[in-house]
Amino acid sequence: MIKPQLSKKIDSVAVLQEKISTAKTVIVFEYASLPVSSFMQLRRELKKTSCEVKVYPKNIMQRAVTNAKQDDLVTFLKGAKALIISPQELLEPIKTIYNFAKKNKAVKIVSGIVEQKIVSLQEIKTLATLPSKEQMLALLAASMFAPLQHLAIGLNMLVQTKKQENPQQ
């Protein structure tokens, strides 16, 4: 018979494994000397983007990551680590934790999983500095309409010069 405590741990591993397997983004970060008030502030900021921040025991994290076929991430789970799990958003949690880590030196991003691929700290920094989807769409729209705008300006200038040459018309 399985002891109740062991049963809870097995359930925790299974739940975390499922979350990791279905998440779009998982970020591992150190929080060792972060005050509770700052951790709660981070939690509130991430909740706006439908993310979950949770501290799990190291063994549960390691087993869940291994069961989720992300074995390379186990090496980053030494010491006091927390997970940000985002089932829907891809870049927003990365940007949020990156900006939070710049303000709070106690938070150190370690690694993560983006679309089931393990990413390094450098890749996370690159993703965090990308423009948002709305900004990218605005840039695309501006670049698509720029030639038309230049054509309209050129034609307008041509009409203006013709009017100056022939003021009778």
Curated annotation (Swiss-Prot):
GO terms for molecular function: large ribosomal subunit rRNA binding. It comes from Onion yellows phytoplasma (strain OY-M). It holds the Pfam family Ribosomal_L10. This is Large ribosomal subunit protein uL10. Forms part of the ribosomal stalk, playing a central role in the interaction of the ribosome with GTP-bound translation factors. The keyword Transport does not apply. HAMAP family: Ribosomal_uL10. Keywords: Ribonucleoprotein, Ribosomal protein, RNA-binding, rRNA-binding. GO terms for biological process: translation. Disulfide bonds: none annotated. Part of the ribosomal stalk of the 50S ribosomal subunit. The N-terminus interacts with L11 and the large rRNA to form the base of the stalk. The C-terminus forms an elongated spine to which L12 dimers bind in a sequential fashion forming a multimeric L10(L12)X complex.
